[in-house]
Amino acid sequence: MRTRPRRARLFLLCLLAWLAAPPASAQGPASCTPSGKNLYVRDRMTDIYFWYREIPNLDPVRFDSPEAYLDAIRYRPLDSTYSYITDRASNAAFFSESQFIGIGLSTSIASDQMRVLQVFPDSPAEEAGLARGDSIIEINGRSVPDLIATGAIDGAFGPAEVGVQVSIVFRNQAGGRTTVNVTKRLVTIPTVSLTRVYDVAGRKIGYIFFRNFVQPSVAALDTAFNELVAAGVTELVLDLRYNGGGLISVAQHLGSLIGGMQTEGQPLAEYFHNDRNAFRNRTIRFESKPNALRLERLVVITTRSSASASELIINALRPFMPVLIVGDRTYGKPVGQYQYDFCDKTLAPVSFTLRNARGEGDFFDGFAPDCAAADDIAHPLGDTLESSLREALTLIHTGACSAPAPLAPRSRVEPGRRAAGWQSLVNAY
């Protein structure tokens, strides 16, 4: 979740998954030299960072870059990737336009395999014939097992620059092997990829596959909810399985569309900052939306990639309606960032935590599923035979899981691979 102060180019970023606007008192660096940037990061971190008391006393001038300095001072027990520094232009493109430079696919890595989870429309990957469920065998002449074993898989597709060419060998689900060459360009991620209505035993059940909480999401969600209201939907399955979070303002909009009249004006979340910034603490509330649904409960599909603003939706609605989780445990990110633009970069330090109307919010272990289900990549998203959606529809129809969910672990479990910065929300190449 993100927010940002006005001085840092008020950009509405309420995300990481909870982004918000940076405090108005933030000033830019004295210079854009390496030492100037590092000193700027020190000044911001020692003021707004949620765990500022844990920052070690290291000389920022000794570090080669602000990224290296930030990595050295972050509070690693809880902040291994959340606070970040990134390129200012690409950060803005993602949050304002839902765009990034790449080939347009997201993947999962298990053991020595890379599988395709999603291919974005009108992307180089789609044009090359890649699809959900395909196995990527080689990237630029190197086998995927070798790339994984040597820790080189993250950079295997090359830099995020327009014109970079990538050679990919993949095998489709029928067993056919194909070699393609794709060229990176600007790719747009649809924030709402699917809106469906299923008729199950006389019930109208709505389904929304929601990919990220960015500015274009507001219009896309309004369109989706208008369709569901017109169809007379009385139940909703919200698919957040690959949604790593985004803007808090978008989470507020979505929560209000789901909560409807029963949550209107109620507390959605309360901000808590460190003691130096307690004056910034405030409460945001559910709003009135003419296209809101009238729901008695919400069913959410999640995986370990569901984080931040996705988890905020679950936590914020639970005081007012049952929120049932199908799939896997969520990531566990109950903290948010303000974003500060400086020179050609953006700094997003963990700055606050959010709690719901019952004061609940420390979900660093994530939320456990009520009904366990696999992310079934053998079937398309939105297909009623896909395991997670099938389980969600079963839960709505019968009131029970098809099989018991596993017991929640008693101690923090580290989730799977997660990139730093806005790239963790894209989770794509």
Where are these regions (language model features)?
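Gly/Ser/Thr-rich loop/hinge elements
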Residues: 190-191, 244-300, 336-340
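Terminal peptide-recognition signature
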Residues: 41, 105, 125, 133-136, ...
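PDZ/PDZ-like domain segments forming the peptide/carboxylate-binding groove
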Residues: 96-138, 142-146, 207, 214-218
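C-terminal functional modules
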Residues: 388, 396-429
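N-terminal signal peptide c-region/cleavage motif recognized by signal peptidases
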Residues: 21-23
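C-terminal, low-ordered peptide segments at domain boundaries
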Residues: 137-233, 286-287
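Extended, small/polar residue-biased N-terminal targeting/export presequences
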Residues: 31-117, 165, 171-194, 415-425
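Bacterial N-terminal signal peptides that target proteins for export
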Residues: 1-12
